[in-house]
Structure formats: C-alpha cells, structure tokens
Amino acid sequence: MSYFAEKLAELAQVGLNRSLPEIEHQGKWIIAQNRKMLNFSSNDYLGLASDTELQQTFLQNILQEAPLHQWFSSSSSRLLTGNFPIYARLEQLLAQRFQRETALLFNSGYHANIGILPALVDKHSLILADKLVHASLIDGTRLAGCDFYRYQHNNLAHLTQLLEKHTGQYRRIIIVTESVFSMDGDVAPLPQLVALKKAFSSQTEVMLYVDEAHAIGVYGANGLGMAEFFDCIDDIDLLVGTFGKALASMGAYLICDQLIKQYLVNTMRPLIFSTALAPINVAWTHFLFEKLPQFQPKRAHLARLSQQLKQAVELRNGDTLATQSCIVPFVVGENRQAVEKSQYLQQQGYYCLPIRPPTVPKGTARIRFSLTADLTEAELNGLIACL
C-alpha cells in the first residue's frame, strides 16, 4: 500500500492531486463549502437540466404511456430482455432527423468510443486520430489493437502525409476526430476531412469517425451539431454524439449505415455485455430531442455569451487557444497557477475549475469556462470583472 501513498504524494507535490467535490446543485448555481456560486463548469450547454417546466411536462406524459414501474430499469442487456420499445423510437427519431439509414444507442460516450473502434478494425486496419481527441477515443484506439498514428492537431498537411504514406498498405483506414474539442474549444475542419477521405478512398477504404459530444444540441440550424453546420452529415461514416451534455440526459448514439449497426450489434462487446440504460432516461432523451429545433434562441444566446467571454479573456492577454465554441479556455500555464486562479474565482462566487495534465498537455494548465444558455449577460459581466 505504500506504493499508492507515494504516488499520491507525488501528484500532490506537482499540483495534480484530485478529489471528488462535495457539491449541491440549485439550477445554474453550485453550493460548495457553504458558498453559493454561479456554475461556469457545466456541460449543460442549453440549460435544460434545470428546466423544471420541461421536466414536469415529461413526467406527466410518460405516466400516460406506461405504468410507473416499467420505466426505472432495463434489468438486462438489449440483446436479452432490456430492449424496450422506447429504444427503437429514439433510434428511429435520430435516423429521421439526421436523414440517415439508422442509429444505435449506447450507455455513454465513453462506452461508445471504447467499443465501436475495436469492433470495426482488425490487423489489416489503421487508425489516424487527431492528437487532441478525448481520452475515450485514445482508449478505444488502444483497445482496437491495430496500428495507429496521431496526427498533429487539426493539421491537414500532416494527416495528408500519413494517408499518402499508408494508403494501399491497409484494408481500412479510419480517421478519428472530435468536431468541437473538449478542452480547447476549437473546431475540426470537417469539410476538408471529408475531402481527404474521398481523395484517398480509391485505393483503400477510408472512413471518417467524428465525435460530436460537445456540438450536438449547440450548433447547426436544428441543433444537430457541426456536421449539420458544415452540411456534411451524409459524408461521415461514423457520427457519434452524447446526450449527457446539451441534451441534459444520459447515453450516446451512433449515426451510421444499417450494415454497420447490424455488425456492431453482433460484435461490439460493451454493447453486448452491458445492462441497457433505464427506459426513463431514453424517454427523456426522446422528449428533448423532439424539441431540439425549438431551442434556436438558446443557441443564439449561448453564441453571444461565448464570443463576449472570448474577447474579454483575450483583452486581458489570456490565451483562448482559438476557441470557436462555448468552451472558452483561459490558459495560465502552470498547475498551481490554475488552481490558485480557480480558488480566487470561487471566492468571488464563480464555480470555475482548473484543468491540468494529463487532461491537457504539460504547460497548458487552464481554467476551462463552460458556458450555458441560462446564464445572463449581467452574470457573465460579473465573471469578466474578476478576470
């Protein structure tokens, strides 16, 4: 046991020790250490998680559909007895909205990302992943067991070099990226990635895998993410997103062709061997996803707040890493500086958290401001005054 104590002491010495926070939620407020603070660290981008009117309407609706006891647990894998009708209804709604053949649900974004890639590749496959993709995609790539390279972040020239070098050597190449990057807030050049995929597909099957976890609900005319914004939904082979952020629910989805879905149902271990989401979670997601186009005013307000905060940080000579989203990083550099800045902002009434290595590269510790549509301009100005 002394080994673990030593390792924890080493983490504490360099400002990397972590602990689970004791917090309470009151809408857009966080209560911690007897202090009430505005939440600037949530992924509840549209502010739906605290919308009690929506919640009450939803609960009234589901009680009319089925008895209460049928909603709380699936009690099984979907391939056994856990496949309730609401799953198919949500998958059909997703396929209809994205105008693609089909969709497949998962328990979480992490669950999706560690399962899809290992199921679809073999020793004749190559994965080319952006250097800054989420930890779940890195883990999925490692679990896949095939050859992989990580191209420089959003660097199309480097990706092109790798494609030129390896096309023809593998049966299948999968390009992997996020659309909105979770820590930097910048955006992948999806149209150019689609063009590269098409350009190299004559010699080798090239597929494009895009994780829209931080884009779904927030971007696009109907809230369908950056793929909708860039009008390239049809060109993305594996379009993944989550429900636990802007959609204030739980779970994840894949938009794909029917053949891919059927193959995953037969081969994806995290899907086959996991108890399915509770039906009430899936029903809540369906309820909100139906309303997604109606939330355009929330998206517009969020975009204005995001631009305002980005400009304010840059005016104070802060590095925002070219963010183009509602994730606004304020890079301070060293771990302890980030922790101290976070503590100061919390003392002023703003719940802002430090992000440190290994979540981000060494020397880029930061405050990661995550904005939500239920924040007001006056509340944002209060934060800006403390920067």
UniProtKB/Swiss-Prot annotation:
Molecular function GO terms recorded: 8-amino-7-oxononanoate synthase activity; pyridoxal phosphate binding
Q: Which residues carry this modification: N6-(pyridoxal phosphate)lysine?
A: 245
* Residues the record lists as binding pyridoxal 5'-phosphate: 109-110, 182, 214, 242
Which pathway does this polypeptide act in?
Cofactor biosynthesis; biotin biosynthesis
EC class, as a word, reads transferase
Catalyses which reaction(s): 6-carboxyhexanoyl-[ACP] + L-alanine + H(+) = (8S)-8-amino-7-oxononanoate + holo-[ACP] + CO2
The protein's superkingdom reads Bacteria
Q: What is its EC number?
A: 2.3.1.47
Per the record, the coiled-coil ranges are none
Query: What is known about what this protein does?
Result: Catalyzes the decarboxylative condensation of pimeloyl-[acyl-carrier protein] and L-alanine to produce 8-amino-7-oxononanoate (AON), [acyl-carrier protein], and carbon dioxide.
Question: What is the protein's given name?
Answer: 8-amino-7-oxononanoate synthase
Q: Which organism is it from?
A: Haemophilus ducreyi (strain 35000HP / ATCC 700724)
User: Corresponding gene?
Assistant: bioF
